């Protein structure tokens, strides 16, 4: 496997998703998806128990039935979940490594035999796959309940480097080392790290120092990720901590402001896109997990729209 550090540059024609090919369609473009439980994915697909899943309100099957045109690309003519042949996902969860073509189920609860949730990766992958002429690999590196302040703490922030910052890069390295085995169709191709998508923030709300340092720590994270992969202009997308929509407490508003401010910090030199997600929150009454506000109440529409926006934000950067 050949590791390529150059960033591919694309032109996307106005009004369509056709992109100029990269230097070679043999190159696998790799996007790192990082964060905590909402990047793991909590959107319910099909579970509809009247007590535990609110009768299926807000699950993927329900929202697809209400708006079939918007979601029609997710299933084939026979009603089976589509599996893309040009976009791939690799995610290690507690059950082990999941690796395969983009479809539902690459989440913290998922396995090859159990696919009942989605995360942002689903529509991120569709956005990138539709825009890029060549194979795409999404490497998910997400763990629930982790803070940027401690767990993902990057080296340039000072102090002890976070365990999950180190594990994030270890997962990427392992994925690239094993790409020929885990994705035989990609065997022998060169790969390049083409973008970084960050969707996190919940745990940093509950520590005064974490709140105050979030903006700076996020800037350090972006700089250090770019340094790790020798790409000072690596495209980066920051997903807003948008749980609950516009109505939010002081601490959540502080994290949101820090995320937005970090995206425009001069030392990053641009090529960072902040994506607001508050508009994608849905009421608990219309969602499967009425007691899980920290997980967007498990609403599949929320996770679909978040992924759509994050993926679209990355495509915007790739146009430059």
Residue ranges and their predicted role:
Residues 5-25:
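Bacterial Sec-dependent signal peptides at the C-terminal "C-region" and cleavage site
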Residues 20-320:
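Cell-envelope and extracellular/periplasmic
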């Amino acid at each position: 496997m050949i590791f390529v550090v150059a960033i591919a540059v694309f032109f996307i024609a106005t009004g369509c998703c056709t992109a100029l090919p990269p230097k070679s369609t043999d190159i696998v473009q790799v996007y790192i998806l990082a964060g905590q439980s909402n990047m793991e994915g909590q959107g319910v697909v099909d579970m509809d128990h009247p007590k535990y899943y609110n009768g299926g309100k807000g699950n993927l099957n329900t929202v697809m039935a209400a708006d079939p045109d918007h979601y029609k690309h997710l299933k084939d003519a026979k009603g089976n979940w589509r599996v893309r042949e040009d976009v791939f996902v690799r995610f290690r969860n507690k059950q082990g490594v999941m690796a395969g073509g983009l479809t539902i189920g690459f989440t913290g609860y998922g396995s090859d035999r159990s696919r009942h949730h989605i995360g942002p990766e689903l529509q991120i992958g569709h956005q990138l796959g539709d825009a890029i002429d060549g194979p795409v690999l999404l490497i998910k590196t997400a763990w629930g309940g982790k803070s940027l302040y401690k767990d993902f703490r990057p080296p340039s922030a000072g102090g002890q480097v976070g365990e999950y910052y180190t594990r994030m890069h270890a997962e990427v390295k392992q994925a690239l080392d094993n790409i020929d085995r885990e994705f035989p169709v990609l065997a022998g191709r060169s790969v390049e790290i083409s973008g970084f998508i960050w969707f996190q923030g919940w745990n940093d709300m509950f520590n005064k120092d974490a709140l105050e340092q979030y903006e700076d720590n996020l800037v350090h994270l972006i700089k250090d990720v770019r340094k790790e992969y020798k790409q000072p202009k690596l495209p980066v997308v920051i997903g807003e901590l948008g749980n609950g929509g516009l109505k939010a407490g002081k601490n959540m508003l502080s994290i949101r402001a820090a995320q937005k401010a970090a995206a425009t910090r001069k030392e990053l030199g641009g090529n960072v896109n902040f994506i607001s997600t508050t508009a994608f929150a849905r009421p608990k009454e219309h969602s499967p997990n009425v007691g899980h506000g920290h997980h967007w109440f498990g609403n599949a529409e929320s996770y679909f729209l978040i992924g759509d926006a994050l993926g679209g934000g990355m495509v915007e950067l790739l146009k430059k």
